[in-house]
Amino acid sequence: MTYVAYREGFADARLDLLAVLITLWGARLTYNFGRKGGYRKGGEDYRWPILRERLGPWKFQLFNATFIAPYQNVLLYLIAAPVHIAWQAKGTPLRGAELALAALFLVLLGFETVADQQQWNFHQEKAARKQRGEPVGDGFLSSGLFRISRHPNYFAEISMWWVFYAMPCAATGQALNWTIAGAVLLTLLFDGST
């Protein structure tokens, strides 16, 4: 993406920075989804079978076609849309606030990565204990970052995209623009699904 931008005359440090942040986020997401079996043949998010059973096959297919598939695509577009606002500020130097927000994004990404690992370790240990016939306690992770919050990874994910929205705002001096829709809709999605 950065190569094409340079080749087409869109070279800009701000756009490069945003591209790097999105790529790092995507790498974490890809790794985490893959290790849970998401890329195996027939693999899917653990919530879909639960929802499919709750709704029944016909209602689930309708829900999938009218909400899940379109919403995810629109949401991915909207959370990345602040890049468009950043592009409008191309050619201006990066501001200190943008660099501070980029650092905060990386801290949140690290926070989410640690939470993901803690959750992974917990579920691996829980499965091993079940297989050995040992008690697993209440079944909830309550140590590490999960001692602070039931969903520290969700907090970090939502916060990253609010920070991502704020970066181009810092570049343009425009505190509010249409691309806020991505952060708002992501927040609503997490709120509605937990």
Where are the model-predicted features located?
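Hydrophobic transmembrane alpha-helices
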Residues: 3-29, 33, 73-118, 123, ...
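Voltage-sensing domain
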Residues: 62, 68-72, 78
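Juxtamembrane interfacial secondary-structure elements that flank transmembrane helices
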Residues: 31-44
